[in-house]
Swiss-Prot record:
Amino-acid positions noted as binding ATP in the UniProt annotation, renumbered to this chain: 29-32, 50, 86-90, 414, 477-479, 493
Known partners and oligomeric status: Forms a cylinder of 14 subunits composed of two heptameric rings stacked back-to-back. Interacts with the co-chaperonin GroES.
Family note: Belongs to the chaperonin (HSP60) family.
Subcellular location: Cytoplasm
GO cellular component annotations of the record: cytoplasm
Main location: cytoplasm
Name this protein carries in UniProt: Chaperonin GroEL
MF terms in GO: ATP binding; ATP-dependent protein folding chaperone; isomerase activity; unfolded protein binding
PROSITE patterns cross-referenced by the UniProt entry: CHAPERONINS_CPN60 (PS00296)
E.C. numbers: 5.6.1.7
Keywords: ATP-binding, Chaperone, Cytoplasm, Isomerase, Nucleotide-binding
A GO BP annotation: protein refolding
Disulfide cysteine pairs (residue numbers): none
Amino acid sequence: MAKEIFFSDEARNRLYEGVRKLNDAVKVTMGPRGRNVLVQKSFGAPAITKDGVSVAKEIELKDALENMGAGLVKEVASKTNDEAGDGTTTATVLAHSIFKEGLRNITAGANPVEVKRGMDKQAAAIIAELKNLSRKVTDKKEIAQVATISANSDSAIGGLIADAMEKVGKDGVITVEEAKSIQDELNVVEGMQFDRGYLSPYFITNAEKMQVELQSPYILLFDKKITNLKDLLPVLEQIQKTGKPLLIIAEDIEGEALATLVVNKLRGVLNISAVKAPGFGDRRKAMLEDIAILTGGEVVSEELGRTLESATLSDLGQASSVIIDKDNTTIVNGAGEKSAIDARIIQIKAQIAETTSDYDKEKLQERLAKLSGGVAVIKVGAATETEMKEKKDRVDDALSATKAAVEEGIVIGGGAAFIKAGAKVDLNLSGDEAIGADIVRRALTAPLRQIAENAGFDAGVVANSVSVSKDDNYGFNAATGEYVDMFKAGIIDPVKVERIALQNAVSVASLLLTTEATISELKEDKPMPAMPDMSGMGGMGGMGGMM
């Protein structure tokens, strides 16, 4: 396959054309009055979205060089979404503005490497200033405001997320699912829940709900299979004397052991239930240890020289109640010591910070939530499947933005924070470095300009009004067309989202500006294959005689 090579200004201009097309499609979604984008799907109904990263992911351009430019900015949107969960449109608009302004200066003779150095210095200074302008999220109202802004001014979604975060805490897990009705719902699971149900329906105590309900049970934790009844007998005899229920959590329980437990349950000798341990391999061992710490018990493990026969009541955990259905087990109010649980939480947080695997990080965060607060499930309802998907995207964005706000704090929203931070930075650079710094400073108005433009206002007038004001909280409410104190109006953005959007935008724009050559595949126009020779088929008329 032949390759096509472009150099210098020609290469950068072709790359810019791809960035411009991507930006034009994404930028219309920005702000409270942003517009929808309709996306054709290979099958089914078209998708309607106001989510910047969803729009960006759908864009593939015919020209290979333009597609390379668009692809790099798509990566910015995707990376911003992965790290901050929101701010994808902001990052795209910033990257386009920086690249456009930088291209003009480099075409006029500026040194790309010096320009890049100035851009990096300016971005670092602005991020530091954003942190100075930020404030901590202090109450449920501010959480609701952040979520509402990120959900495209949907206050119902904002309130739902604030309720969920209040109930499970900042370390709790909040998941988003599709509801079976048109109503939004919030379900909160208190205590630790894991996805293992009862091993036999004969353990059920509440036939109406098809659940096992154990009050103040002992909890036996074993990391191997239990098949032999005699191994269990000593601990069962001790439990019978107490008159309390027993929950057994083990790798598996089968054969004679399970049959005998069921018989004892049916005869009323013991109030007992059994479930499989959650997870697999090393993760199973870690989760059993989590349950042990939460309930104040110990894992009976042959690796530690313990056998099931040696288990005593002091090895067993306890909880105020346990509820088991066919799919899940929930342990409420474990009897573990708070200091031990806190130490375990610190240990898991350290593992989250160290791991590089997204899958491992997700599983560790689930374990952290189960230990620290619980799990909230937001069920999103809508009249049609298309509306459901669009709404679910907005809830996911709002949830990520809220977590980012709790993590690093908030600044004024609507693109005004960038302008206020930029006004406070004066690096006193010279030469082409100063040009690079000025490129970033100019680009900082782009998000506010776009928000104003989408709302039908004069972008230049709005940007100038915010720039000249000395009030750090002064900004433009695009929903009403008024200039307001942004904190008081509840128009706020997470610092983390602004920081990551700017970092990623400067990073990709500087890469594009320092590109001196591009290599892409040359599409060759292949001639249509010739039609086969049909001349020999003339005699087929005589085939009628075959009848």
